[in-house]
Regions:
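Core catalytic region of metal-dependent phosphoesterases/phosphodiesterases
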Residues: 2-96
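Structural motif
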Residues: 3-5, 32, 101-105, 125
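Histidine-centered divalent metal-coordination motifs
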Residues: 10-12, 74-75, 105, 126-130
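Short, well-ordered secondary-structure micro-motifs
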Residues: 41-45, 80-84, 89, 113-115, ...
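Generic structural signal for conserved hydrophobic packing positions in ordered secondary structure
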Residues: 59, 94, 103-105, 146
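Conserved beta-sheet core of the metallophosphoesterase superfamily
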Residues: 100, 107-173
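Charged phosphate-binding loop/patch that engages nucleotide di/tri-phosphates or the phosphate backbone
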Residues: 163-189
Length: 189
């Protein structure tokens, strides 16, 4: 399975256009959007080129290219969710190559084990921190594509592609920010 993920677009059309172009090139089986799609929130600066009003049409273009799974972030108000042309759940379970991937924005789940209620081998795909991540701790795997619009801790704007057990975070110039592989049971390779 090939899956493209992006997070924390915060109303920046250029980020969504970039992601749509990558989806057009890669032809993934699924796109996963990890929340904070339209609004920047009170703790973040207004993104350059902020244009949430035009993003629903861009989301429709993305939906024409691949199935979209979207989860709601802490900055996604109910009115925002009404404008987005696909459902936004609090979380989603994705089966990819024998891995159980739990997708959420990440603001309600701990960053490190223990992970009460989850089996070892679970992969957590999340956004929220605006920081790319790929690591396995105590049998739990944590992936984060970083932020497409407002990266933090000196990281570049980024997105990710999953294929054949490997999660790779890429910057907007095509460079690899990080790569993390897991086996079919969710353990790091």
């Amino acid at each position: 399975m090939r899956m493209v993920s992006g997070s924390d677009l915060h109303g920046a059309p250029d980020s969504l256009i970039f992601l749509t172009d990558r989806v057009r090139e890669l032809k993934p089986d699924r796109v996963v959007l990890l929340g904070d799609l339209l609004y920047h929130g009170p703790r973040n600066p207004l993104p350059g080129g902020y244009g949430a009003k035009g993003m629903p049409d861009l989301f429709r273009t993305l939906m024409d290219l691949a199935p979209v799974t979207a989860v709601r972030g802490n900055c996604d108000a109910e009115i925002d969710c009404m404008l987005v042309p696909f459902p936004m759940a609090e979380s989603a379970i994705i089966d990819a190559d024998g891995l159980q991937i739990y997708a959420s924005h990440g603001h309600h789940i701990p960053e490190i084990p223990p992970m009460d209620g989850f089996a070892r081998g679970t992969v957590f795909l999340r956004g929220h921190t605006h920081v790319p991540r790929g690591e396995t701790i105590d049998g739990f795997t944590f992936w984060n594509p970083g932020s497409m619009t407002l990266p933090k801790r000196g990281y570049p704007r980024s997105w990710a592609v999953y294929e054949d057990g490997t999660f790779t975070v890429k910057d907007f110039e095509g460079g690899t920010v990080l790569s993390h592989a897991v086996s079919g049971n969710g353990a790091g390779k």
